[in-house]
């Protein structure tokens, strides 16, 4: 596969993909590029709206029916449920790590398996999260790039 980048200051940014057929890898790139235009609406502690790029999300957590979006420098509430966010941002590197948790695997710094089957992930901001044993096998498949069936 060839990659060619042409810089032109006069034209609006545009990405053109030429291919014989759309393979799963190419479709993933297309989906990822298209998802960049979708931002997640959040509300901060002062009830001010702000928007988060899906790539900037470290993890998403549901606590007592409220969904929180965590980035490296902000936390916000969203009206969307975990399931809605998981369905809408399937192309982002999000993984459902527990019933109440979605983690962005692009921000994982390290992993540590536990004897009880759980996996402790350390994010690049040094925060630690737990992948439940129920999701651990699927998590390993996702990291290997294998197809897996969502629970």
Segments and roles (model prediction):
Residues 19, 129-132:
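Active-site-adjacent beta-strand anchor residues
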Residues 25-130:
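Conserved binding/recognition cores within well-folded domains
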Residues 148-151:
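…primarily DNA-binding HTH/wHTH and HhH modules…
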């Amino acid at each position: 596969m060839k990659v060619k980048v042409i810089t032109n200051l006069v034209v609006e940014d545009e990405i053109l993909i030429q291919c014989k057929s759309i393979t799963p890898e190419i479709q993933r790139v297309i989906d990822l590029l298209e998802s960049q235009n979708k931002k997640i609406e959040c509300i901060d502690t002062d009830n001010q709206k702000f928007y988060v790029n899906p790539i900037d999300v470290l993890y998403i957590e549901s606590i007592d029916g409220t969904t929180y979006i965590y980035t490296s420098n902000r936390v916000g509430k969203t009206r969307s449920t975990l399931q809605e966010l998981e369905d809408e941002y399937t192309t982002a590197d999000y993984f459902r790590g527990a019933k109440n948790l979605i983690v962005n695997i692009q921000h994982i710094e390290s992993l540590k398996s536990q004897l009880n089957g759980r996996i402790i992930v350390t994010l690049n901001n040094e925060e630690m999260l737990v992948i439940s044993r129920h999701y651990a096998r699927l998590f390993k498949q996702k990291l290997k790039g294998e197809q897996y069936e969502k629970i």
